[in-house]
Amino acid sequence: MDGKLRADEVAVTKSILKSTFNMWMDVIDVDVVIVGAGPSGLTAAKYLAQKGVKTVVLERHLSFGGGTWGGGMGFPNIVVEKPADEILREAGIKLDEVDGEDELFTADSVEVPAKLGVAAIDAGAKILTGIVVEDLILKEDKIAGVVIQSYAIEKAGLHIDPLTISAKYVIDSTGHDASAVHTLARKNKDLGIEVPGEKSMWAEKGENSLTRNTREIFPGLYVCGMAANAYHAGYRMGAIFGGMYLSGKKCAEMILEKMEK
């Protein structure tokens, strides 16, 4: 390649500002906001966007995937069981059978979030990183969107007013913290919402309770993944992720069913 590269500083800045403005104008009014881009959130985003639902995923960190990247104690593998393996296969993720375990598979802890994130994006979901949801929009006893702030501004402790995104439905997929539900409970004590938090580890119990605990816990607000178990005092599971993928898929299906009515 012999051609000279064009790199005008002002043109770069203008390009970023124009694209960013157009992007924000497109996402300030959506069908679904997903808070947290972990395994359940990305899965929900994929299945919602595939059906043409306008979906935006907000993640406070600069990367998506939640705790998947670290595998188990830093070892670069996670475990997934049947039938959740089909969700990963749909995203083109390679799975290895576990000797002596007919129902279990291992997957690369870097490949999984990378390909699942791409699958959500390719389906039409928008993932925004570095954005924290600091509050919810509550109108007439229904969640109507989220209040957002730059995570960098929050970390710096600066007093700067936030912006908002309007949504028909909000999903809390923030993991163990269940931060969106905690915020709703803390700021609106008259609603009587309590978040007991998750119990200690019991992998089988925790996995099987995830889909059961995935539900609409307040008009317009759903919980999935570990946020669902935190809200319902379910057990934690460790580095087995099948329940979280199934929870995200179920959450998407519940919202799709409601939107069809």
UniProtKB/Swiss-Prot annotation:
Keywords: Iron, Metal-binding, NAD, Thiamine biosynthesis, Transferase
Coiled coil: none
Binding, NAD(+): S40, E59, R60, G67, V133, H159, I160, D161, S179, M226
Top-level taxonomic group: Archaea
Subunit structure: Homooctamer; tetramer of dimers.
UniProt similarity note: Belongs to the THI4 family.
Name of the protein: Thiamine thiazole synthase
Organism of derivation: Methanococcus maripaludis (strain C5 / ATCC BAA-1333)
